[in-house]
């Protein structure tokens, strides 16, 4: 039973590259502290699981499930999130680079604007910590749905997380305080539509190996 | 419009009567049937250095006030549905009542179980409560470290409470997700807000420091009153 140790994936851009939508300070804390903590706790849970498996300790194995779900989910969600963001004004932020996804969005919600509105309403309706996702149901090129997951619950296979938005307060609070609507409005300026198109058309085989 | 009305009515109410709820939050006030944001009994900066003035101000004026406003909006919809005998809508509104009503209750209780050091914040409990803590946890310090562990273990947003079991009279530590309020079998004695907005501007990801600093501004006199 080998247990692979997970490490913090580097960001595909500089900490200040998402400004003014997300500040450098938020990105540094979010990546270096919050994401790192999920990874540390995931590694600890995996190592405890390996020992419990070796000794066939079923009660311990069961009691570890929630830690795995929370910290593994935290690692997966943040890994997906960093990659589905891009600095504002880059070509990747242009929805024209996501033709198949755009067509599917328009056929599902009537227009890109209607989708943006529906997605925002879903995000702002979250009660507590969680994530908002555009999900392709059942696999690549599936029916699109707006889904929220609580705390660090991930989007489970076979559903495909096309892109996700972190709605934990630590994702925006230092900059937006209680104005989470301002954060939700700004997020569209940094969505990586090219990455979203790739996930929608080809699926996500392993969110930790994007 | 409704917010304006209740606001001015609240000013008028302040000098007069204030309603007391059965949940034990002495500061729950209503004006013309609407919940209103209770005043704090101390200044925003009075809990420093445990909790910064900026945090207290945003937390009270913005976060708590949003729960109050949203609760009142929910209540209006609920009353409309009741008047029409619309059962489906009444049921659909339950999560909103729980979340916004819970947020209002929790924060009201929280402000009251905090106090500046100059007003007795951090002074250990005495009497029956002190005895109950010692006999349940061994010592106040033991209780505090168990409470801090419970707070640190919350996955997501939520609260940790010292509660009294109404059936047995025993005290215990319980955590609640999001704004779920302490109702039913348990009575809230002491609540600590573990939402990130309660500490992030000052402590960022170092939430353990917030949990350890808050004991300096706990109003044990309020907790004793709730216990007895």
Swiss-Prot record, chain A:
The keyword Mitochondrion applies. PROSITE patterns: SOD_MN. Mn(2+) binds at residues 30, 78, 166, 170. Gene3D superfamilies: Fe,Mn superoxide dismutase (SOD) domain (1.10.287.990), Iron/manganese superoxide dismutase, C-terminal domain (3.55.40.20). One of its GO terms (molecular function) is manganese ion binding. The N-terminus is blocked. Belongs to the iron/manganese superoxide dismutase family. Homotetramer. This is Superoxide dismutase [Mn], mitochondrial. It comes from Penicillium chrysogenum (Penicillium notatum). The gene is SOD.
